[in-house]
Amino acid sequence: GLFPSLGSTTAGSLLSGLWLQDVLMLAVLACFLAARKTSWRMIGVRAPQGRHPYLGAVIGGILLYVLMTLLVQLINALLPNGLSAQNVQSYMQADDALWVKIFVVLTMGVFVPIAEELIFRGYLFNSLCRYLTPQMAMLFTAVIFGCAHMDAQRAIPLAVGGYLLNVIAVRYQSVFASAIAHGLWNAVMIVAYYSVL
């Protein structure tokens, strides 16, 4: 694997898979941008603009966590057998070494959100804006984001979260703002999950 020091643990497999997937997605994105002669800045890779953008991104991340928790609890209550564990949760349960937990939080709270924001709120959203109104592009991007996680039970909450991340990216004219919110959402979720294990 990419992280031989993790051994053959399921956490190591998860992290290797996530890093490989995201590195490949970013490589494909870089090729698309080069082929279209589009700069990274054109897809939102720039400092957040507007009033208090970093504070807004942090507040957005906290609100995302609260809203997603409520939506997941609602869905959990409506399903006869409740929600099944996410793959990430299953992997996190398999290895309880502190350094693995820290690495999972960093991976899910930093690397994955940056990659996903560049793909969804950066490239996809801006590409759809060529053919759709910004509101429709936000909606389509959110639905694709929800479906891309390959979790039918959580697709709606993830789409809602994706829409709110679009709002943050558009509001602050930067995928860095939405990456901060996304990273905080993921990190708080993982830390909260670890705290109840």
Would you name each region that the model predicts?
Residues Q135-L197:
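Functionally important transmembrane alpha-helices
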Residues G12-C31:
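Selective recognition of hydrophobic, aromatic-rich stretches within alpha-helical transmembrane segments
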Residues G1-L18, K37-V112, R130:
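Juxtamembrane helix-loop-helix connectors linking adjacent transmembrane helices
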Residues A30, Q73, G122, N126, ...:
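Transmembrane alpha-helix boundary and packing residues in multipass membrane permease domains
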Residues C31-W40, I168-Y172:
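Structural signal for the C-terminal ends of transmembrane alpha-helices
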Residues R51, A115-F140, V170-S174:
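Membrane-interface helix/loop boundary segments of multi-pass membrane proteins
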Residues I114-I119, Y123-L124, D151, L184, ...:
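Active-site His/Glu-centered metal-binding helix of metallohydrolases
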Residues Q21-M25, V104-M108, L158-L165:
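Hydrophobic core segments of transmembrane alpha-helices in multi-pass, intramembrane catalytic enzymes
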